[in-house]
UniProtKB/Swiss-Prot annotation:
SUPFAM superfamilies: Acylphosphatase/BLUF domain-like (SSF54975)
Keyword Hydrolase: yes
UniProt keyword list: Hydrolase
Active-site residues per Swiss-Prot or TrEMBL entry: R22, N40
Protein name: Acylphosphatase
Annotated Pfam families: Acylphosphatase
Length: 93
């Protein structure tokens, strides 16, 4: 039996709006087989919600914290929980 899916909620701070960050995140998440979304917020942060296997979510978190993202990431505040919401695909909001 496989482990249950997890939910990664990551608040990405920095220069991450208007630079293709949500599109880039969507591409990486889909490559990893994750579902969820990336959404701009009025305060300049991007909220990333990803669901799927823990290893894939951890890889996405590493990518979000890495130096290959569009723009400039100052910090990522991440929270882990059980996947309870039914989300299909990965969208930009």
């Amino acid at each position: 039996m496989s482990a249950p899916d997890v939910r990664l909620t990551a608040w990405v701070h920095g220069w991450v709006q208007g630079v293709g960050f949500r599109w880039w995140t969507r591409c990486r998440a889909l490559e990893l087989g994750l579902t969820g979304y990336a959404a701009n917020h009025a305060d300049g942060r991007v909220l990333v919600v990803a669901q799927g296997p823990r290893a894939a979510c951890q890889k996405l978190l590493q990518l979000l914290q890495g130096d290959t993202t569009p723009g400039r990431v100052a910090k990522v505040v991440a929270d882990w929980s059980q996947s309870t919401e039914q989300i299909t695909g990965f969208s930009e909001r």
